[in-house]
Amino acid sequence: MASPNVIAYLMLLIWPAVCWQMWKRLDPARALIWTILGGYLIMPPMTAINLPIVPDLDKVSIPNLTALICATWLLKDKITILPSAPVGKALILLFILAPFATVLTNGDALYFEMRTIQGMKIYDSVASVANQAIVLLPFFLGRRYLGTPEGTRAVLVALVAGGVAYSVPMLIEARFSPQMNIWVYGFFQHDFFQTIRQGGFRPVVFLQHGLWVAFFTLMALLAALAMLRDAPAAARPRAAAILIYLFYMLLVCKSAGPLVYLVSLSPLLVFVGSRVQILVAA
């Protein structure tokens, strides 16, 4: 596989500046959403700036850390990390410290005929613990800025808008094969043969695998369904058209799993109240 080009690393470096401007111009809810979602959709996959000791800076860690910095430095806001409930604190600490258990139980080396794989050391767990904490940052920030009806609607709007915008490169790749990441970032991020389906291709765009694109499209489709359910009568024709279009895009993804989830989850969104939805999600 070819290596990422200069544009890929340049994107990693400029994304914090882009996010800083979004946090200056948008309300905190939308700024947070597009910092995380935008980075997920357009930043290069499998590309990282490797620094000693600290976690790799990639399309996950850079948006998450940038959002935290913008919230605390630009907005001068205080972000509560640990929940008030003891059970919540225990679960978060267990998630963050789990890499230590992995290291302690994988200290033996593996010996093969041609090579040897060294056992894990305590040093290996340091970056892993930091990575676990970074993964949780969007949840802490989301609790602060998205825990309102307006914040929830902003998430739905962003998912639908992102799905519609992403459909353009998806359609290009479905027709001409997954090439966007090669054209922009200089490499293909997975096994090309896994993109060949049903006489055509599954789009990958800037995500790591075609399944990731399919599940993102599913999320956009479910968000569109929720918006259609709550839309006023005058806005329903447009909302229905977007829903049908995103359903077509899910078919373009040529993945059976997301279709099964769609059939399973759609009735919950349409016919069931929020209390039951939360219980099912739990």
Predicted regions and their residues:
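N-terminal hydrophobic segments of proteins, predominantly signal-anchor/transmembrane helices
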Residues: 30-51, 61-133
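Juxtamembrane membrane-water interface segments that cap and precede transmembrane helices
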Residues: 46-51, 115-118, 191-206
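Membrane-embedded alpha-helical segments of multi-pass membrane proteins
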Residues: 5-17, 42, 56-75, 129-137, ...
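Membrane-embedded, hydrophobic transmembrane alpha-helices
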Residues: 1-57
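Alpha-helical transmembrane segments and terminal signal-anchor/GPI-anchor hydrophobic tails
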Residues: 277-282
